[in-house]
Amino acid sequence: MTQLHIGDKAPDFTSVDQNGEPISLGSFIGKKVVLYFYPKDDTPGCTAQACNLRDNYASLSGKGFQVIGVSNDSIKKHKKFENKYELPFPLVADEDKTIVELYGVYGEKKFMGKAYMGINRTTFLIDEKGNINNIIAKPDTANQSQQVLDQWQS
């Protein structure tokens, strides 16, 4: 598993968003990026996280942040999730797990004593030059946007 650190160059990727449009991290050079990895569309924790970012999107955008969500759900599931909760930011479909493995967030998890493989919820804060400014492991889903503001390293 890849281990990324603060100060590392954020790995570039190209995939598709919920509209089937190409999206690459490199196209956001010059902006601060909130790249958040989450396990599954329309589940309680993931919905709380997405809605918190949605509810604070204007504030984050006003401070120069671009929000991008990534999970290994399909384009169709992402579109349904976007529509249901009126999400104003791209959701990247990483069905083949290339991006989650590139960022080292795909691995063993445990639930009720059973081990399984999945995405470990993690948020990467990426600066305007494409470097990792901070990493929020196990973010607080209900307060993700405040964590972004509190943990951005100026």
Outline where the language-model segments fall:
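Chalcogenol-based redox active-site neighborhoods
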Residues: 1-154
